[in-house]
């Protein structure tokens, strides 16, 4: 889970942990990028607006890295305009959720669709 908001990071971490997933958190895109290059993950969930590296750049770097191209990526962002959603999907995100219409069940269903149940 990559998000500069402690509240959002903890919410997503607890939601996934309570379902049996092992969760690692990163405070921004740069920390997320360093983590995915050095550890093995089944899924990345990232915000867009973050310091040092935004989520779009993180998704793009993941999609450009030969050893990470198949890593599923979800964006969960406050940006709710259609052009923001399209930008995230064009960068290579598998799912794009807005925090304003965020539902735990939707996120968990998307995680299950991408990597299966914990």
What are these regions (language model features)?
Residues 10-18:
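Charged docking surfaces used in two-component/phosphorelay signaling
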Residues 39-45:
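Active-site beta3 strand of CheY-like receiver
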Residues 50:
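Receiver (REC) domain active-site loop signature in two-component systems and cognate sites
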Residues 47, 77:
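Active-site residues of response regulator receiver
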Residues 20-27, 35:
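Short hydrophobic/Thr-rich beta-strand motif most characteristic of the beta2 strand and flanking loop
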């Amino acid at each position: 889970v990559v998000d500069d908001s402690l509240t959002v990071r903890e919410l997503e971490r607890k939601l996934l942990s309570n379902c049996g997933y092992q969760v690692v958190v990163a405070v921004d895109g740069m920390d997320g990028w360093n983590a995915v290059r050095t550890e093995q993950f089944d899924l990345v969930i990232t915000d867009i607006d973050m310091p040092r590296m935004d989520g779009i750049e993180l998704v793009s770097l993941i999609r450009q890295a030969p050893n990470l191209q198949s890593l599923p990526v979800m964006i969960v962002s406050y940006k709710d305009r259609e052009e923001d959603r399209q930008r995230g999907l064009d960068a290579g995100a598998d799912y794009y959720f807005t925090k304003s219409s965020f539902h735990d069940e939707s996120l968990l269903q998307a995680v299950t669709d991408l990597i299966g149940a914990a």
